[in-house]
Design a protein with these regions (language model features):
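N-terminal hydrophobic or amphipathic helices/low-complexity stretches enriched
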Residues: 19-73, 240, 247, 303-305, ...
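Second-shell loop/turn segments in exported
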Residues: 21-26, 42-52, 94, 116-120, ...
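Metal-dependent peptidase/peptidase-like ectodomains
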Residues: 106-107, 219-252, 363-472
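Extracellular/luminal Protease-associated
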Residues: 109-224, 230, 295, 325-328, ...
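Acidic/histidine-rich catalytic neighborhood of metal-dependent amide-processing enzymes
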Residues: 173-179, 183, 200, 316, ...
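Long, well-ordered, tryptophan-enriched scaffold segments
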Residues: 190-191, 195-199, 214, 218-287
């Protein structure tokens, strides 16, 4: 109890000192936007992992870090290079069909479905199909979609989603690609077909399917292989999903209606098999994380780190939309990388001396499956036990005034409490994720820190369900997310960006100055990773 009281006291002191400053104090949004304008310029060519455009962006970041007086913290100066395997589908030499009652029913790649090339797909597959509901096994809730099923030699068909009585972060964890495949593979499956629930799709299928035109990647080192035994991986268009269920006694519409109530779905064999022929083009490449250090000043705590992370990669040059082929990624995530640079610059000018050190981490390969942070978390350039927290900044969307802050991971660790204190000191309300079904908690780089036992969270400008602000966010996702229109021509709320920067900076300072490390909450599912790490 005494330790907890001391922790709260230190937090209140740090927050109180910070709250005396009129917000925003350190930022005006303009310097942040100046960084964004460089990183999201057409000259950076969309910052595809391993591309010349990304290397140019990283060179710029390193130059800015040097100007801010930060020390290199990579394995080669500011850089930590990782090896990747890139896979691209050759569609003209690939095909897909259903086989029903001995008859071939061809499917159109791109229109009906597309291959996921994150997997080293088998050249040819023909296998029976089984619908397995959400495809989840969650022992903490005594929930198992696969109970009693024999999937040996079969391909599992799943509808993305989760049952209602499973908390958001827990459901998100088990819906991660690696965890879901681990469960299916253990049951004997050789492949997986995922169907997006139209109610939770961020972008329309027409844009989602463009992913097939870009190479997927994986880390080349076998230690990172989480797709063992997966011979086939497909995404299926919800508008075409009825074809899968013909003659099964169930319709796709029926399943969607059950999923609306987040009830457990029926499981049943389908009347068709899947037949696939795949040709892949593979190549090896390298890409780097950029890492810098601001040393702390306390004799003991300077050996511990608060990590600020943001991914710098985006989608590169791709299929044109309205004549534009450059996917600039201004909000996703030049905005986050720019914020780290702006905070680094502000600390250079600040007389404030931090007790803990700050690690600025700009990761590659996020758009390819959180690969850069996955590599760093497994091979950190500092003592892994020295990292006390990760504050991840990814697509925080300052497109409406910042009145409400959404904290992903709010209830999982002390970090959530600290974020709430700092935000409220700036007159900003806080909410947990209002749409846990979108699985944002596991869809960005904080997740790899969490899996290594390090308390972590992400935050974004928030909106309440049904509000005008939420409508603006939904329109942004539909029109700009993973599209060339996420560029420098979109409306941006600079005061919102500045205030968000103040909150991130304030949270960072609170963690850096607190004599105690952030702890996982006793009832957090993710606490087990800290225990496994021996902390």
């Amino acid at each position: 109890m005494l330790k907890k009281l001391l922790h709260i006291s230190a937090l209140l002191i740090a927050t109180s000192a910070f709250s005396q400053q009129t917000a925003p104090t350190h930022f005006d949004g303009k310097s942040w936007w100046d960084y964004v304008k460089v990183l999201a310029d057409d000259n950076m060519e969309g910052r595809e992992t391993g591309s010349a455009g990304l290397r140019r962006a990283e060179t710029y970041i390193v130059d800015q870090l040097k100007q801010a007086g930060l020390q290199p913290a990579g394995t080669d100066g500011y850089y930590q290079t990782a090896k990747f395997t890139s896979r691209a589908i050759v569609e003209k030499d690939s095909s897909l069909a259903l086989v029903r009652n001995g008859k071939l029913e061809p499917l159109t790649l791109g229109e009906d479905a597309f291959f996921s090339t994150r997997v080293d797909l088998a050249p040819e597959v023909e296998a029976p199909l089984v619908f397995v509901g959400y495809g989840l096994s969650i022992p903490e809730k005594n929930y198992d979609d696969l109970a009693g099923l024999d999937l040996h030699g079969k391909v599992a068909v799943i509808l993305n989603g989760s049952p209602a009585d499973v908390p958001g972060p827990l459901a998100s964890h088990y819906q991660s690609t690696a965890e879901r495949w681990k469960t299916l593979h253990k049951a004997g499956a050789i492949g997986m077909i995922g169907i997006a629930n139209p109610a939770s799709m961020d972008i329309p299928w027409s844009r989602m399917s463009l992913a097939r035109t870009r190479p997927s990647m994986s880390l080349a080192d076998p230690e990172f292989n989480d797709t063992e035994g997966e011979k086939l991986a497909l995404y299926f268009n919800p508008a075409s999903a009825g074809k899968l269920f013909e003659g099964s006694g169930h319709s796709f519409e029926e399943l969607i209606n059950i999923a609306k109530g987040r009830k457990q779905l029926p499981r049943f064999p389908l009347t068709a098999s899947i037949k696939a022929k795949v040709k892949l083009e593979k190549k090896d490449l390298e890409s780097a994380n950029v890492i810098a250090r601001l040393p702390g000043n306390d004799a003991t705590l300077k050996n511990e780190y608060v990590v600020l992370s943001a991914h710098i990669d985006h989608l590169g040059i791709g299929e044109p939309i309205n004549g534009d082929r450059i996917y600039n990624g201004a909000m996703d995530n030049a905005s986050g990388s720019a914020l780290l640079l702006d905070i680094a610059s502000s600390l250079k000018k600040s007389p404030e001396k931090l007790n803990r050190s700050i690690l600025f981490l700009f990761v590659t390969g996020e758009e390819k499956g959180l690969l850069g942070s996955k590599y760093f978390a497994a091979h950190p350039t500092v003592d892994p036990k020295s990292m006390v927290a990760d504050i991840n900044v990814d697509m925080f969307l300052p497109i409406v005034p910042l009145k409400l802050l959404t904290v992903f991971g709010l209830a999982e660790s002390d970090l959530g409490d600290m974020a709430q204190e700092v935000a409220q000191a700036h007159g900003v309300s806080v909410q947990a994720d209002p749409e846990p079904q979108r699985n944002i908690f596991i869809r960005s780089d904080q997740y790899n820190f969490i899996r290594h036992g390090i308390p972590a969270l992400a935050m974004g400008v928030g909106a309440t369900p049904g509000s005008p602000e939420q409508k603006i966010f939904k329109e942004w996702l539909t029109q700009r997310y993973h599209a060339p229109s996420d560029d420098l021509n979109q409306p941006v709320d600079l005061p919102a960006a500045a205030l968000y920067e103040e909150v991130v900076r304030g949270l960072m300072i609170s963690v850096a100055q607190d004599p105690h490390r952030p702890q996982w909450k006793q009832d957090s599912f993710f606490r087990r990773y800290s225990q496994a790490a021996g902390e």
